[in-house]
Regions:
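ATP-dependent adenylation/nucleotidyltransferase module used to activate substrates
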Residues: 1-219
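ATP/NTP-dependent adenylation/nucleotidyl-transfer catalytic domains that generate, transfer
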Residues: 20-21, 25, 196-198, 210-279
Length: 279
């Protein structure tokens, strides 16, 4: 048995742990969630699982089309992008770093925030000195500490995606099946170590590697948007969090003029700090 088939059969075993009528697939239209869609509908033919997507206004056109095509229900965000920008700010460096910047800009001067902003080391709860993963470049630190840095926050994901899903779960009583993988980064590797989260969300792909996923896509000729020929992961169009891999610039090049203008207007201040060439 090929490794991809072994994984799919093991995935069947994982799905036997849940009652399908108590869960819904959180469908983003991306590579991982579409693999789950294909598995549920085509491979295992599991009935009773609703497919629920969210129109965040920020998806790549191909991804948005998939959401509309394959979802039973399409949710809308609790706030629109520019409403979030006005009230909270926009992403810039990384989710972890932006969270500390957000707290500092909202007035927090607690020790943990100041240590992470002003130095690369901090004293942990264990009393030992740790190297901080939070590090701003000189320009950004000077702008932040002088009060000249634009309003920064990672909250767009909360209001565009998490809040609509949370509301749907409360109203429907259903729990989410998430297409998240531990191999997608250090943070997710520590967050997802089994099929279930603490709040009973089902994460059956937590142990799926890129190699096996690609093998499944190739063997079964599963539909893959052309955007994946240019970038490894899709999220919100032009999100600055992809700048360290230069994915942000690649994404902008794929957009039409109107889409690029919208994205560049939304992330304008962050692009200027990061020297991302938009329009």
């Amino acid at each position: 048995m090929e490794i991809c088939d072994f994984y799919l059969e093991d995935l069947k075993t994982k799905f036997r742990k849940i009652n399908p009528e108590e869960y819904y697939l959180s469908y983003s239209g991306g590579k991982d969630s579409h693999l789950l869609y294909w598995f549920i509908k085509e491979y295992a033919k599991i009935d009773g699982i609703k497919i629920v997507g969210i129109n965040t206004y920020m998806e790549h056109p191909e991804i948005r089309e998939r959401i509309e095509k394959y979802s039973d229900i399409v949710l809308m965000p609790t706030m629109k992008p520019f409403e979030i920008k006005e009230k909270y700010g926009i992403p810039c460096f990384s989710k972890i770093q932006d969270d500390f910047i957000d707290r500092y800009q909202r007035g927090s001067r607690c020790k943990s925030v100041l240590e992470r902003i002003k130095s690369r080391q901090f004293v942990g709860r264990d009393g030992k000195i740790h190297n901080s993963s939070f590090s701003l470049n000189k320009k950004a630190r000077e702008l932040l500490l002088s009060g000249k840095l634009h309003k920064i926050s990672p909250k767009c994901c909360k209001y565009l995606k998490k809040e609509p899903a949370k509301k749907y779960e409360k109203e429907s009583g259903l729990k989410a099946i998430l297409g998240v993988r531990g191999s997608e980064g250090a943070m997710r590797r520590s967050q997802y170590t089994s099929c279930f989260t603490k709040d009973k969300k089902f994460t059956p792909l937590w142990d799926l590697t890129d190699e096996i996923e690609n093998a499944i896509y190739e063997k079964y000729n599963i539909e893959l948007p052309k955007v994946y020929e240019h970038i490894e992961r899709t999220g919100c169009m032009g999100c600055p969090y992809g700048h360290y891999k230069h994915d942000t610039e690649k994404e902008l090049a794929l957009l039409n003029e109107a889409q690029r203008h919208f994205v560049c207007s939304y992330f304008k201040e962050s692009y200027e700090v990061l020297n991302i060439k938009g329009e």
